[in-house]
Amino acid sequence: MLDAEQKKNYVAGAFGEFVGTAYFLFMGVGGAVNFLNNAAGSPLPGFAIPFCFGFSLFVNVFIWAPISGGVFNPSITIALMATNPKDFPWYRGILYIVSQFLGALFGSWLIDLIQPEAPNAATLLADGVSVAQGLFMEMFATSVLTMAVLILAGERYGKYLAPFGIGMSLFISALCAGPYTGASLNPARTLGPAIVANQYGRAHWIYYVGPTLGSLLAAGYWHILRILNIDVVDLKNVLNKCKKCGKEDPRISLKHCEECLKDDPKPEKYDIESQN
């Protein structure tokens, strides 16, 4: 049973996911609208639209991560449930997923209400792209984004750079998949604009199945790493050895041995070399 503190934290997390997802869509679509309206006929939108969504994700993850984790994506929520059921049980996942879909719907509605002559932000398959191609494009692009979350945020590596890395992974994935599928990588990002615009397009289901398969693929990668007991590349993986006393120290940035400096505080006398 959940105690009062856990319930409060889960409700706060769900609120953070609702607001964060709404602002992620609002800022991403709003920025894209600005570029589309002011750079029509130029190649700029092809670069700027992925940038808007990537930067919006970066900013909102940075803001909301301390509250909810800054997930904003039902597919990635499923991956978190699959990789960390202790900290992310199914009932927390369902609460987050509902909040994310509602937040995306609210953010899409705000854009439609506030932005004058806002174009349709629905994700649609491009002409000439088959359903299978679109499905696999969404799947593999989402797996990249999910791995960024699992490694940078879920494993607590890159604590301060995690929001930037996650935003950049969306940016590069959107550059790759955008011309073909609209680069959803997020069922909530697809459903909100689709409902507001009442436009679902061809094979709309791939925007739910593809990202979910991609997130599960990334979860599979994560489990393989755990089974093989392979740690993420990090400073602690590098064994450094003080040339004076021979003591190993994992801090690659350390230029001298602290214990040796107690006797002689001149750091230039010591050198630590990396050992394989």
Swiss-Prot record:
It is found in: Cell membrane. It catalyses: H2O(in) = H2O(out). It is a multi-pass membrane protein. Water channel required to facilitate the transport of water across membranes. Stimulates plant drought tolerance by facilitating the transport of water from the arbuscular mycorrhiza fungus to host plants. GO terms for cellular component: plasma membrane. Belongs to the MIP/aquaporin (TC 1.A.8) family. The chain crosses the membrane at residues 11-31, 47-67, 94-114, 134-154, 160-180, 205-225. A motif (NPA 2) lies at residues 186-188. Residues 32-46, 115-133, 181-204 are extracellular. Keywords: Cell membrane, Membrane, Repeat, Transmembrane, Transmembrane helix, Transport. GO terms for molecular function: water channel activity. This is Aquaporin-1. The keyword Transport applies. InterPro entries: Aquaporin-like, Aquaporin_transptr, MIP. Induction: Expression is increased significantly in arbuscule-enriched cortical cells and extraradical mycelia of maize roots under drought stress.
